Amino acid sequence: MTSNKKSRLPPYQPGEHVSPSVHLNCVLLTTTVVNFLDLFQLSSVLFALPNIQQALGFASEDINWVLIVYNITFAAFLLIAGQLGQRFGLEKIFIAGTATLTISNVINTTAPNKGALLAGRAISGVGAGLTAPNGLAILSNTFPDPESRNKALAIYTACGPLGSTIGTVVGSHLACMSGWRSIFWLCLILTGLSTILACLFLPRFAKRKDMPIDIPGTVVFTAGVALLVYGLNDSSRRGWTSAAMLTGIILGVCLLFVFLWVEAKVSNPAISSYLWKSGPFLVMLVAIFAFGGSFSTWFFISTQLCVNLLGYSTILTAVYFLPAAFAAIASGVFATPLIRLAGEKNILVAGLAITAAGAVAWAFAGPRIGPAVPTTGRDTAIIFVIGSPVALVPTQSILLREVEAGNHAVAGALFNTAYQVGASVILAGANALMDRSRANVQGVRQVTIDGYLNAFWLIAGVLGAAALTVMVCYWPGKDDLVERQTEEANAVGPLAVDKVDTSKDATASARSVADTRL
């Protein structure tokens, strides 16, 4: 249930002195910038790994830990972050996350050795894990009616691909021109500014003291996700016959099953029991698992193909993906009108189908095309990425509608966990396919074009299966949909984004929030 108590803005906040519409947009800007940075910080070091390896003495088989450790802590801390946000206030945990990101980048910029850098990257993952679920919950509670929420989610979602792409462009340029540490200096500046924005513009959210933290379930879930993500990410380094890798995966899966058992026994489960019985909620988790995993895998494989096989420079490779990132923003603008015109289910299926078509197009884009490769790669990237907001906006909207407003942070945690675990699972599968197609090139075993193409076919198959799953398994009930949308439009969220005015009653405050538009 949502609290009817009005929240108060700290007196130092500009939100106390501006119109509700301006304040709404400032909240959207703050959460979107941090979402952008979560992916920017991951992709920006991708092409700087050789420089880092040489400077800090990483072994060639260990350098990927700069990426892996970020993924592990990011995924592992999502559920606890969602619960902490609901218990102590969404904005408090969000600000704690941005502050953690800032501190971690201080460590990264000054890291004297590889241990210090890995520690800093692990802390960065914790910060990202604290911000991701609470940022989504902040938006869903700030924009309670479906139309304005979908507009906000479209903008929020579109900046994800932009963060990945601009991260590769900026990171590769800085690594070549100013050294790899300059990447973390830039991240330090941006995360510091994000912390200031969050302190200035995020209102206070109601604390849910009636929702104690599920400590046993959270501990088991965190350990299970961490081991699973570790094992899957390490498979590309150790191979599928490694005892350490198999142990991590098996223990991770077993702990996640134990988590389900714990949730059925405890009196205060982290994930409310009604969610496990919600067909639409589970279908949306499958959709985000498939889409998130496919997008992350596609981005990694396509950039590696351009650099390792086609011989492009890192900067040129990154630039080729820029049009796709801006195309995602353009498609995000049209996501909400399309949903209103054709319905959430149809647009979701269309978004998954578009990205699957983009993966199929990539499966035909190889060196055999000759001079057309740059143009073809750019165009196929646009096809793939343009479906991102089209698929994610209805997915988020449907998922959040199945959840009580007070549980949106945990729902956001599950959303992001499905995304991260999907990325690890599908990338591991793609790496296994590529490893089967290696050949000796000048004494070095490299992945052949057939290996990359097989990986793109895997991505297309996963996305196609997800589209079919949504078509077959998700059937929205018209009456239930209207009822839920009416409840949301009339709800008094835990957030009062208008100026504090004690002379107005809670009903008037709720009406001002529900009527506000972007």
From Swiss-Prot:
Matching entries from CDD domains are given as: MFS_MMR_MDR_like (cd17321)
GO MF terms, alphabetically ordered: transmembrane transporter activity
Q: Which Pfam families match?
A: MFS_1 (PF07690)
Compartments in which it is found: Membrane
Q: Which domain of life is it from?
A: Eukaryota
Q: Which GO terms describe its cellular component?
A: membrane
Its job: Major facilitator superfamily transporter that may be involved in A.fumigatus adaptation to azoles such as vorizonazole.
Instruction: State the family named in the UniProt similarity comment for this chain.
Output: Belongs to the major facilitator superfamily. EmrB family.
Concerning PANTHER family, the annotation shows: MAJOR FACILITATOR SUPERFAMILY MULTIDRUG TRANSPORTER MFSC
Q: What is the protein name given in its UniProt record? A: Major facilitator superfamily multidrug transporter mfsC
Organism of this sequence: Aspergillus fumigatus (strain ATCC MYA-4609 / CBS 101355 / FGSC A1100 / Af293)
